[in-house]
């Protein structure tokens, strides 16, 4: 299975800028799409064909644009997210407007093509607004509620892009995406703590007697924090496995792509285990070999 995403899939006529009305500091199309190769999970395998690749890249571009506005924008992030919300509304009404940010125009055209619920696109904005105001989550259920905005909409949009959406597939996809989000939170404990955010549930910190200050301390992690990460990894693995029937329910290129996402999740969790559940020594990254092994295993199952 090819796991390297393509470097560029701009349709003819799209630009590399930000449109005419974007606030200063909003990243352009080329900057966003140039980062695809560094992602944990395969965005668009070269085996998917140009039509599906273009659809996935449109979704990736929107998700990464919103994440960058919420995480890295140098100015007022809530105002930048408000701009993105307004830009999306404008694009949904006039998706061919050349004044739009190219990534917003691209995802609006896709939403019309696949008849996607625009609220799924807006959920990503809502999640990033929460990131500006909610520094932590008391319970695991609270964290799952956040994942319903930050991660699960992406899976549902991907299913729509594959013309494969059903209620059962939505449920499996939600499990997969929630697990992937938890894996990312485990990888990024130190980075999130530096940004003033704690995604590990407070009830779990208390259970494992982990002081929140430990999350941003210099490594290596102590035994209590390692125990907590081991617990979260096991929970994420269980949720990911519960969502795996999604792969078997799909056929053709959709099955290939979703197998890649699920395999990427298992490989990320493997990387945390290989690091002895220490999240403070730098975000553990999955090995390509592990990703291929997991992906192959998923694809050969009936």
Language-model features: locations:
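Catalytic cores of Mg2+-dependent Asp-rich isoprenoid enzymes
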Residues: 1-15, 19-181, 186-302
């Amino acid at each position: 299975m090819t796991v390297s995403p393509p470097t560029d899939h701009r349709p003819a006529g799209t630009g590399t800028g930000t449109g005419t009305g974007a606030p200063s500091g909003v990243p352009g199309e080329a900057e966003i799409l140039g980062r695809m190769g560094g992602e944990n999970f395969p965005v668009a395998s070269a085996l998917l064909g140009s039509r599906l690749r273009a659809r996935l890249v449109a979704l990736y571009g929107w998700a990464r644009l919103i994440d960058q506005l919420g995480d890295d924008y140098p100015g007022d992030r809530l105002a930048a997210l408000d701009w993105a919300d307004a830009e999306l509304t404008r694009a949904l009404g006039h998706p061919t407007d050349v004044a739009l940010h190219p990534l917003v125009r691209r995802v609006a055209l896709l939403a019309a093509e696949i008849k996607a619920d625009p609220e799924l696109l807006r959920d990503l904005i809502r999640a990033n607004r929460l990131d500006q105001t909610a520094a932590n989550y008391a319970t695991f259920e609270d964290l799952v509620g956040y994942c319903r905005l930050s991660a699960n909409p992406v899976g549902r949009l991907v299913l729509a892009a594959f013309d494969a959406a059903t209620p059962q597939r939505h449920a499996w996809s939600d499990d997969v995406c929630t697990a992937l989000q938890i894996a990312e939170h485990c990888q990024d404990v130190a980075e999130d703590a530096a940004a003033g955010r704690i995604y590990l549930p407070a009830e779990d910190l208390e259970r494992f007697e982990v002081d929140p200050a430990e999350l941003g301390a210099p490594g290596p992690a102590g035994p209590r924090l390692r125990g907590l990460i081991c617990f979260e990894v096991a929970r994420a693995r269980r949720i990911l496995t519960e969502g795996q029937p999604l792969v078997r329910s799909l056929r053709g290129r959709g099955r290939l792509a979703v197998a890649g996402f699920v395999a990427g999740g298992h490989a990320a969790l493997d990387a945390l285990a290989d690091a002895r559940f220490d999240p403070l020594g730098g975000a553990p990254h999955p090995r390509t070999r592990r990703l291929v092994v997991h992906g192959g295993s998923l694809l050969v199952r009936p």
